[in-house]
Each structure stands twice: as structure tokens, then as C-alpha cells.
Amino acid sequence: MIACGAARYALARGDRAEAAELWPLVEWCLEYCRRQLTADGVVASDTDELEGRFPTGDANLCTSTLYYDALLSAVSLGRELGVESAQTARYAAQARALARAIDAHFGGEVGGYDTYRYYAGNTLLRSWICMPLIVGLKERSEGTVRALLGPELMTDDGLLTQQGSSTFWDRSTLYALRGIFRAGYADKAGDFLHRFT
């Protein structure tokens, strides 16, 4: 999460000196995540944004998609900073491999939708299935958008954290909206937005 946030912050801020100061942190975090890759090529992690309030398995969709986005952001930031092209090419190759691993490990049918399992063995829809959409992974966008907007997750208050629960979180609702827009479903995202304004 730090690599993703720091790289995106540096790119948005546009301050070369500050970006150069943050670059070693980004590199360190990317290397840490790389060393946490499982045999399936996704990031091993026993926690996520919800800090243990819901099950996450040994590797979760949110952590791996944030690492994917961090790799892509580091490619852009590295190019801006004049980092050796071999390093940015390595990050780009790692991102491509991770995209394939995310689909292979997390992709599947959940609740009748062609979408993502939040972790291996998960059988309930989770609001954070929006994460691949946010980072530009579109292989399962149609099913994921349908799942996010379906009755299993959608409530008058926003998206449920997990199908069948009563917990919702504004952050995942806003992330889902962003992901639906990014996946190219502006009409559905617009309808979604109007429900909450």
C-alpha cells in the first residue's frame, strides 16, 4: 500500500526532489512485496484494509492489486526520475506476471457472477472485488460490475463489505464507483452515483 500511495503521490505532486527522496521507499516496498509472492504468484498477506474484521485468507485480492498498481506507478515514476530502463522494464514485466496471477488465483465464479474470490476458498461476494477494476484489470469487468451492483452487495447505504453481512463501508462504495467508471461502464456508474446524491 505504501509503494502505491508514495508513487502515485510523487507523480501527482510533480516535485522531482521530493519524488527522488521517496523513490528508495518505493523500491524497498516493491522488493518486500516481491519477496512475499506465493507459488501462485500473488502476494501473501494475512490482513487487509479491514484489519481482521472479515476473513482474508493467506493472500487477498486487495493486497495483490495494490502491488500491481504500485509496480505500474513505479514504472511511470522511474521514467520521470531517469531510473535505468532495465529497472522499469523489470517492474513492467513483474506487473504483467502479477496480472496473470491475479486472474488465475482469484478469478472465478462467486454467487453466479464471473468475478473474483477475495481469497482462495472464499464463496461470498466482497465489495473489494472492485480493486481489479480500479487498477485497470478488465478480464472480468462485466461480471464484477454486475456483482457490485447486484442485490447481494448493493444496499441503500452503499455496498456491503461481504454478501450476507450488515456491514458496509463508504470507502469500498466509493472505490467501487471509481472502478465501474474506469472499467468503461459510465452509464451504470452514473446511475450508482445518483442513488447516493
List each language-model region with its residue ranges:
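Hydrophobic or amphipathic alpha-helical targeting/insertion segments
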Residues: 9-12
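Short amphipathic coiled-coil heptad-repeat segments
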Residues: 101-106
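A short, charged helix-loop
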Residues: 42, 47-52
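Substrate-binding cleft and catalytic face of glycoside hydrolase catalytic domains
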Residues: 7, 23, 27, 36
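Residue register of alpha-helical TPR repeats
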Residues: 1-4, 69
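Active-site core of glycosidic bond-cleaving carbohydrate-active enzymes
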Residues: 20, 24-31, 52, 56-89, ...
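Glycine-rich, acidic and aromatic/proline-enriched surface loops and short helix-turn segments
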Residues: 2, 31-39, 139
